[in-house]
């Protein structure tokens, strides 16, 4: 034991470095499946949109989302966005969202991480509801079953806006119960598709957004894999030096 202690004192730095490199290698290997999952779920299934929070919203969609919220959420939603007239849009926004030049848009303000997470929690349910309603064919059996009794000229959003808070709360409770069974991954994909639909509505090239997300995530994945490989090689080299 004393002899081992003597050799350990001589090589303590390389040994500790090997332990650190092995830890980094294991972390990189554990991270790779997450990146692959993001490429499949977000990059492919959700079109590259990984959040329920839109950077921009059309006036119509903003109003539709608004009526799907209770009063507290409406206040936070209002505080998170600002309306920009079409004449005041910057060139990058005009280029990315051509349809915004016809009407103006609501732009997301600069939020800190906590504010963004709170807004995302607020917007998931309304985004799913709006996407579901907007994707329905007005002549379909499902639409007629749910909204066929509405007076002529009244939309589902008009009807929901006329509800009192108690009726809204009852409706939201039923939707919450359905959302619980969907799972976090499914909710994320569905919300991402809602954001994608809104971007396309404003003229954005969603295919470019998707390709950029897949490319960026793929590059990160390759970087993590390369880092893990370097750690493995370096650890093997140091271990051989210590063993020699």
Spans of model-derived segments:
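Membrane-integrated ABC transporters
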Residues: 1-32, 38-221, 231-239, 243
